[in-house]
Structure formats: structure tokens, C-alpha cells
């Protein structure tokens, strides 16, 4: 969720007291750097399954104002129930005008971590996820990464 530039809008919403429940809704595919930035800024986050449907569903149930996916689909629940690129652009422009700074400067502090997406075809997804060897390999990678990265198998 939330590429670098819309995260500027999240911080702006927090500054102005408009980040309801101090929470942003993301998906399990969101960049690791995003969570580190939110932690540093004291912004809470919730992770949902991938898809606007799941993001908005969580937002509606929990009174959250902003959420989205890494793809750039950003939802502002006060105005829409799906991602809206024009609305997102307007919200980012609002911050740039108020702060009198270019987006490049506003978004500079956010470090985006490298990500690798591997699609592996299997005949039985549940069996593959429940396989002890797969679980052990995932655990080993997660331990090796520590707090510098993550592994997601879905």
C-alpha cells in the first residue's frame, strides 16, 4: 500500500488531526519501508488481504480515513470507496501547496526497500503452504532477515 508520495498525505492528515484512529490500512504486499516510516512517525497501520475490496471493508468497519495498495490505489473513505487517482493527486497537491515544497522534498525521507515478487505455480496451494519443508524454509528466511526484511508466502 501507499507508494512514497501518498504517504506524505498520511503524515499531513495526522498533523491536522484528520487521521481517524491514527491508522492507515495497507495490504500484506506493502513495502517494508512504509511500515518503518509509519513506526517512526507514530502512525498505526492495519494489514489486509490484497484488493481494494478488503482495504475498504476494513476501513468501513474500523473508521479509518485512508488506505490503499502498493499498486497506487489509494482510498480516501470520506470521498470514495475505491482508489481514485485524481483524488489522490489532488490530496498530494493540497499538501505541496500548504507546505510550499515539491513532492520530491516531501517524500525524500521515506526509504523504499527492494522487493522481489516470485510467482511459483503449485497444483495444491494449501498443501504447499502447509508443507513442513516449505514452512521451515520460510521460517529460516524470516529469521535470517530479522527486522531488515520479510518474506510473504500466499
Name each region found by the language model:
Residues 1-13:
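Cysteine protease catalytic core and zymogen-processing segment of caspase-like enzymes
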